[in-house]
Amino acid sequence: MAGKSTPMMEQYLALKAEASAGGDDCLLFYRMGDFFELFFEDAKVASGILDIALTARGKDSGEPVPMCGVPVHSAEGYLARLIKAGQRVAIAEQVETPEEAKARARREGKPVSKVLVKRDIVRFVTAGTLTEEALLEPRRANVLAAVCEVRGTLGIAHCDISTGRMELEECAPDAMDAALARLGASEVVAPENWDGAPADATLRPPSEFASDEGEARLKAIHDVATLDGFGDFSRAMLAAAGGLIGYLDHAGRGTLPFLLPPVVARGEAKLAMDAATRSSLEILVSQQDARSGSLIAAVDRCVTGAGARQLAEDLAAPLTEREPIERRLALVHFFHADPLLRADLREVMRAVPDLARALGRIVAGRGSPRDLGQIRDGLAEARRIRDYLASKPDRPALLDDLLPAMGGHGALVDHLQRALVPAPPTAREQGGYIAAGFDAALDELRDVSGNARRAIAALETRYRGETGIERLKIKHNGVLGYFIEVPAKHADALMAPDSGFTHRQTMAGAVRFNSLQLHEEASRISEAGGRALAAEEAHFEELVATVGDAREAIARTADALARIDVAAGLAERAAEGDWCKPAITDERVLDIVGGRHPVVEAALKQAGDRFVPNDCTLSGSDRLWLIGGPNMGGKSTFLRQNALIVLLAQAGSYVPASTATIGLVDRLFSRVGASDNLARGRSTFMVEMVETAAILAQASDRSFVILDEVGRGTSTYDGLALAWAVVEAVHETIQCRCLFATHYHELARLAETCDSLSLHHVRAREWKGDLVLLHELAEGPADRSYGLAVAKLAGVPAPVVKRARSVLEKLEKGREETGGLAAGLGELPLFAAALEERPEKIGDSMREKLAALDIDALSPREALDLLYALKTEASQTED
């Protein structure tokens, strides 16, 4: 920047340079009184995102300096929008008052009039470091992850600083994308010199990712001499932990958030799914990047935010071991079997505040009296819930394991109940949150203040009588304090030297005064109020410390409540949808009777329609189903619904089916649908091949694979050849359970050579080009794809469909005669000629159909289908 700057602007530029040191690209919120101001390019960026006015302040090099600002009291909402837009924000606060700045100037012998209040960056606000309630989604965890590679092993450390949970894990470098997709991290941190860093990672100095540094930091945080009591951590895990804690230290400017002792995340005990599978199955977000339309939206019946976050974690990382799955299922069954118990419990749970996040804010030094009140109320409700559930017979083992964590806080709850008012405020600056009777000295100070206020009210009455001014009032504001206000027309009476009043301020329609008595009472209020605020602040710090001492026990209580909420919510969902408890087995089977797609079924139900259930039975002797049939017939839905049923079962949930036996799956793969990844130069076909290659390389005989339309997007013969080879590889080499949907009828010949492959199709009917989709799965190969009928159903003009039918007939004739698809095309008339249609005699056609019918042989369903087809044909005739 050229040209002379004001001291304020020099301070701003110095802070901006500090905020941007190390390559950090962030906006600077610069505190000026009651506003956070932004200047230069920051102002342009923020004003565009926030849709606020862009103004100017002063000049730089002869040009106005762009500026915008947001009020401090509502800054959280603006911060949330900036973070959602992908920005990072440095907060520069005033770290001294104007009075302290003036006193400093006097000590330094500098002019008081030119002194500048000190400001410093107190915090960096980023997507992964949020703790404020207004900035977080109640039903979604906010995960920060750090990744690095140590001697060929990838270390991952991740935490949610709003709750303090921290886990360390390791995996092969090529599994990084799948691991990060499972975590759904809001922000990822990586060493800046690492070629393997994720493209969108926040890069940090490599020195922070040293295993020795990570070990030392963890020991210091938890005040232990060894980490052996927490788990067996590898060097890669500790290196990632060092990077994570180093970034948190940087973001908090030396103040670390609340972190629970780290635990080892056992990746091998979780159902492995890559990013493509998660996207395809729409587990936590839909293809439109929204919660609506996702699996969790269809399943979530939790009544607390903590429960919803736990459910999301369960769905993102289902289990692969039978015993813990069955423990979860037993807890769901306990609540499912007793509707009255479930209803009572859920009603009580609705009153449970978010203990984990309130605790996180308190321990991080950003807590409020309201957070303390939430700790008090949450622990009290936990005690009630524990006592209620403990009185029930036949409790499952998991519930008995959870109940002890929900008690033991009696002394803390009693202390908080005595100390706090029933509904503590969010802000503590005005006081009023310590309950009467908790501190006699504080009560006395409040009495002094209250007596002075009553004296001021009496003064107002007295002054009205003495002056005869009925509209005389004693008011208060933050600038003048207490003052006497009268209408301007009565001001002369109070201006007299012997009136006892002192002029303070003249307004447009009123004049303000002071008096000796008012000054004395105001001083008493101010002095007593200041001392009362100091006393409340001291009590607040003591309460925060007391809660902090119990933080690990409170966190365990929060986890137990969340787990119970998840189980009760899943039981509620099962009761709503007539879901069944799945049987879990170690055998390589998948036996689902009456299976439904949970998301599609919910959408159809909302529209007043019904989902058609289907069975799926895979075993060692019949482990690969080849499924044909028309588009829109339900093939993709059938594939996905079975994958989701497996996922739900291994997450510990009931499933949408009449009965279900689930053989444990170690890896779940879905290659259903694709979209062009133009940003990375990948076409639909390339994406399909990359995903298929990953499946062939990573699937085991215990995996479950769903594949849809492999080979589309290239020439017919290339696609058919690829699909053929993939089916053979899955059947002969991998030997896993697999559903394979295709339009290649030629693949049906594989049933002759693949002993464990069977043919299936989705049923459909066609009458004179009108397609009726039954959405039912049947055994045997599909006789045709009904592509032209689907095209007509989609609204393709009739002449085009007719032309396509002519081309199809010639193609099929050529293949029969010469084996070549293109043979016979030369006999086709020109396209324009083919479009010249003569009106079809629909009446004759309908008579022919009716004459050929064997009415006694029609089932009720077939008769109804025929009636609809004839009605459609008649409507087209009228058009």
Swiss-Prot record:
Q: Which GO terms describe its biological process?
A: mismatch repair
Q: Identify the residues that bind ATP.
A: G629, P630, N631, M632, G633, G634, K635, S636
Write out the entry's keywords from A to Z: ATP-binding, DNA damage, DNA repair, DNA-binding, Nucleotide-binding
- The answer to whether UniProt assigns keyword DNA damage to this entry is yes
What Pfam families does the record tag this protein with? MutS_I, MutS_II, MutS_III, MutS_IV, MutS_V
This protein's source sits in the domain of life called Bacteria
* UniProt keyword Protein biosynthesis, yes or no: no
Q: Cross-referenced Gene3D superfamilies, in alphabetical order?
A: 1.10.1420.10, 6.10.140.430, DNA repair protein MutS, domain I (3.40.1170.10), MutS, connector domain (3.30.420.110), P-loop containing nucleotide triphosphate hydrolases (3.40.50.300)
Q: Name one GO molecular function term.
A: mismatched DNA binding
Record-level GO cellular component terms: cytosol
Function, in words: This protein is involved in the repair of mismatches in DNA. It is possible that it carries out the mismatch recognition step. This protein has a weak ATPase activity.
Q: Which family does it belong to?
A: Belongs to the DNA mismatch repair MutS family.
What protein name is recorded for this chain? DNA mismatch repair protein MutS
Which species does the entry assign this protein to? Erythrobacter litoralis (strain HTCC2594)
Q: What is the lineage of its organism?
A: Bacteria, Pseudomonadati, Pseudomonadota, Alphaproteobacteria, Sphingomonadales
Q: Coding gene?
A: mutS
